[in-house]
């Protein structure tokens, strides 16, 4: 079968004999393509031509085994620098057309541009040495003549020379780091291109703010605890101070309370800044920023009918009346009144439970004291008092 016009199929054995001077990764897409065109991560490679001493060739390698790769003599392409990370590559006629190259790292882009310029100058001088050209201190635009030579198609390189794919763990980490740097540096276009590559390969990411974005810690969080079992008595509340970091999540705070005070996360309901907290959000997102910021912890009661197997040993259920037994007197928790055996029980004050955070509210409150949820329309104070 005849090779493509203006070129020839390269033998796989020739690849191993070429001395690779530098290989870099860049997001490549046709220059004339629309803004919705997908950029493909490709490897640019500059190597010495073993058949032409003192000459070099530029290779554009695809990802994955069996991919068709392109290479051109360096003197046959036109290479232009448009910005710190934006370059253009114009192959000779018969090639894929002008390509836009976006590098993930400005230093890597500068090093590549300097090497291409040095190799171009050395090739034009007709040097007989295959030694790498000297790297200059800075990159300058490179624009080379374009003689009518077509690109050469060649088979896939050896397995050891394949470019890293985003399916590789190392490549994923590098791309994730590049995405973080692009966002931190305000490079919207670079961040979009790296994100597109990650999305094409469906890489699972967890995007979180760094601790430097949050207020400094630790700080003392003033926590008021309420026990649902005895919400009408003075012994139903206690006040404690917890050392926390604003960047910690509510879930981490729940585990801290379980470790220090013994209440499992399943019975904890946190209200901070008039909001019922969700485990995934940070404390700072609810306004926790400095010493003395308040928080409210509402402790649910365990079900009346416990299972036959008993509570889990890892997360034991909080039983009614446990708040007074778990807190030492140093926390300022007043002892509950001990009614005489002959005294009649006092009538319960009518109250209503918030449907959002389950806080027990006074009967005359139109909304929840903790989270401002409106009182249920179906609540009847007379019926509540009679029960």
UniProtKB/Swiss-Prot annotation:
Mention any one GO cellular component term assigned to this protein in its UniProt record: LUBAC complex
Documented effect of changing residue 357 to S: Abolishes binding to ubiquitin without affecting interaction with RNF31
Major place of residence? cytoplasm
- The answer on whether this UniProt entry bears the keyword Transmembrane reads no
- Phosphoserine modification sites are 165, 312
Pathway annotation? Protein modification; protein ubiquitination
Pfam (any one):
LTM
Sequence ranges of Low complexity compositional bias:
339-349
The observed outcome of changing residue 371 to S is: Abolishes binding to ubiquitin without affecting interaction with RNF31
Q: Where is the Ubiquitin-like domain?
A: 219-288
Disease implication from the record: Autoinflammation with episodic fever and immune dysregulation: An autosomal recessive disorder characterized by recurrent fever and autoinflammation with onset in infancy or early childhood. Variable clinical manifestations include lymphadenopathy, hepatosplenomegaly, gastrointestinal inflammation, polyarthritis and joint inflammation, parotitis, and immune dysregulation.
Describe, as the record does, how this protein assembles with itself and its partners.
Monomer and homodimer. Component of the LUBAC complex (linear ubiquitin chain assembly complex) which consists of SHARPIN, RBCK1 and RNF31. LUBAC has a MW of approximately 600 kDa suggesting a heteromultimeric assembly of its subunits. Associates with the TNF-R1 signaling complex (TNF-RSC) in a stimulation-dependent manner. Interacts with EYA1, EYA2, SHANK1 and SHANK3 (via ANK repeats).
What residue spans carry the region label Disordered?
122-169, 305-349
Q: Where is the composition biased (Polar residues)?
A: 122-132
Purpose: Component of the LUBAC complex which conjugates linear polyubiquitin chains in a head-to-tail manner to substrates and plays a key role in NF-kappa-B activation and regulation of inflammation. LUBAC conjugates linear polyubiquitin to IKBKG and RIPK1 and is involved in activation of the canonical NF-kappa-B and the JNK signaling pathways. Linear ubiquitination mediated by the LUBAC complex interferes with TNF-induced cell death and thereby prevents inflammation.
Q: Coiled coil located at which positions?
A: none
Domain of life the protein comes from:
Eukaryota
Outcome when changing residue 114 to D: Abolishes homodimerization
| Disulfide-bonded cysteines | none
Q: Could you identify this protein by its name?
A: Sharpin
